[in-house]
């Protein structure tokens, strides 16, 4: 088990938001309309992975109506090809190390508002 992320990777959280009928939330990426994904985002300085998960849920999905089911035990690291690395990384990272969170959605569809904050997603659905 790895409790600390590898140093050459940007720390990040991923969220699997699960509805009562066991479908999973996915959002259509604002900057890549052909791409649909689960919410994810970086961990801010001084923030725990769980705190980052709550913040990302609020910023990207527009809700806080969820209960924690499980957190991944290990950091899951992957490399990003050099030509696809964002310029704002400025060579600091070779990829991302993620902690994943399974969350039970406790609200109604009307409690989701992807337009509320960051506008990472232009549309959403349960799959």
Question: Where do the protein language model's features map onto the residues?
Answer:
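Short connector loops at helix/strand junctions that flank enzyme active sites
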Residues: 10, 33, 38, 94-100
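Conserved N-terminal beta-strand and adjoining loop/helix that marks the start
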Residues: 2-24, 42-45
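Short loop segments at secondary-structure junctions
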Residues: 19-22, 30, 104-109
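Unchanged
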Residues: 43-127
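Surface-exposed, flexible loop/turn segments at secondary-structure boundaries
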Residues: 23, 32, 74-76
């Amino acid at each position: 088990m790895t409790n600390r992320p590898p140093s050459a990777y940007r720390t990040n959280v991923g969220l699997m938001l699960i509805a009562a009928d066991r479908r999973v939330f996915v959002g259509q990426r604002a900057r890549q309309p052909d791409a649909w994904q689960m919410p994810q985002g970086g961990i801010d300085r001084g923030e725990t992975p769980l705190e980052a998960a709550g913040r990302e849920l609020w910023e990207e999905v527009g809700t806080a109506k969820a209960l924690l089911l499980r957190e991944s035990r290990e950091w899951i690291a992957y490399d990003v090809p050099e030509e696809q690395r964002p310029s704002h990384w400025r060579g600091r990272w070779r990829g991302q190390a993620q902690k994943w969170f399974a969350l039970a959605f406790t609200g109604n569809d009307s409690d989701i508002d992807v337009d509320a904050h960051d506008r990472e997603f232009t549309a959403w659905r349960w799959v």
